[in-house]
Amino acid sequence: MAFNVAEFRANMIGDGARPNLFQVSLTFPTVATNGTAAAQKTIFMAKSAQLPGSTVGTVPVFYFGRELKFAGNRTFTDWTLQIINDEDFVVRNALESWMNAINSHAGNVRNTGAVNPTGYTVDAVVTQYGKAGNELKSYNFVGVFPLDIAPIDLDWGSNDVIEEYSATFAFQYWESNTTT
């Protein structure tokens, strides 16, 4: 096959999808302090995210010394957001209170509002947009809850920067507007 720039360009629909045209919508459960305000702010403060992946495992079966592989179960890797921190700490405080409701710092107990998964899990959506502002694809993460809030490094020599931190979430599975 000969190298053909015109064919390549003709197959690059919309000049390619751009990773900076996205939005995250993360709701917070009622056990999270200021969850409504944090949800509204996350739309603007979620600096980076991922479109999800998944893995189908294999089930090896041996037959006369030969390994045969059969399709196994699907698994999903954790989902991480990079979040910009502003001076009201609304998103971080809501994430901390959400995690504390799941398992408190001192008491090692769960908040009564978070006894069942419906009390501490929510859905989250990542939407990828085209350059004209049209929605290209969206993913709904089902049963999201926080696993990790990364520390924020402080440094007297850090000038001209805004604090950022990552938050990692577990989820049950994802659904897409284009995947059945």
Where in this protein do the model-derived segments appear?
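Glycine-rich, low-complexity intrinsically disordered segments
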Residues: 1-180
